[in-house]
Amino acid sequence: NVGKSTLMNHLIGQKIAITSKKPQTTRNRIQTVYTCEKGQIVFLDTPGIHKAKNKLGEYMVAVAERTLKEVDAIMWLVEPSTFIGAGERHIAEQLQGVGVPVILIINKIDTVKKEEILPAIDTYRKICDFAEIIPCSALRGQNTEDIIDSILKYLPYGPMFYDEDTVTDQPQRQIVRSEERRVGKE
């Protein structure tokens, strides 16, 4: 669990996406909207790309892979590690030919020593050509404004898709149901 939903919730300032310590908590694509004076960002929080072990896993990976073709920029969230496994290499290969800027977000920097962050950046830089690499802590809000500024640089100019009060395409009932499901499992 690299903290995609935690980051989305922090960036828009509301708890929309379910967060959990378990990986693959996000099962469907969740759209959230961030609006500021500089522009509007529509985030698509997808299930993580992983090696599927069953039909649900295959569905979740397909949702994530389809989304790669619909966006103006991609944020790839990882943890601060110098170990690159087969899963990360697979994702890096998929991202090489997408034709849009890929921003690497190294999340959870609050869980490692500062000296460990640069080696993690160097490790990831070797496997993919990133437009930018931003270390952050979604939980603590460290460097999250840098993420917003970075994304805004890559978005095309045009009208806003949503009014400034919209934060998600999820109906309130779905958000409550998701929260009830999460609370019921803890």
Residue ranges and their predicted role:
Residues 1, 9, 105-107, 184:
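Amphipathic alpha-helical repeat scaffolds
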Residues 1-62, 66-68:
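Conserved G1/Walker A P-loop phosphate-binding module
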Residues 14, 33-37, 52, 67-74, ...:
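Conserved, well-folded catalytic cores of nucleic-acid-processing
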Residues 23-25, 47-50, 80-84, 109-112, ...:
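Conserved nucleotide-binding/hydrolysis micro-motifs of P-loop NTPases
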Residues 38, 62-131:
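Conserved C-terminal guanine-recognition region of P-loop GTPase G domains, centered on the G4
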Residues 110-168:
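Canonical P-loop GTPase G-domain recognition
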Residues 164-178:
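Solvent-exposed, charged helical/coil patches
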Residues 180-186:
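Conserved small/polar residues in nucleotide/adenosyl-binding loops
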